[in-house]
Amino acid sequence: MGQVYWSWEAEVKPGELENFKDNVVRDWNETAAKDCNTLINQWVIDEGGSSVKVYQRFTSAKHALAQFADNPGWEKLDDYLEPSAMFVCGDYGNELDFLREHGAVFMQDL
């Protein structure tokens, strides 16, 4: 099974940027850095400070799925953000199908 990667986008709730950075991003990045199956983990923010995006790449769909249990940051996102988009790419198989119910778009290579 090959690598899986995604981008997840959201709008920052008014007044919540610093709380988001303090209560999610720091711990999220530490969790990802310790996981040998997380190949890429990068949070970015637009210049206006109102939209964020995380890029992640994993060794497999199985390990991507494990992030939802292993990374407590996923449970906190709704406290600070309004999700707007998710794009899933790579060898995702069926393991990540539950993300479709949450609006994820599954992309294929051209």
Please annotate each region the language model reported.
Residues 1-52, 59-70, 79-110:
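Short S/T/G/P-rich N-terminal loop/turn motif that feeds into the first structured element of a domain
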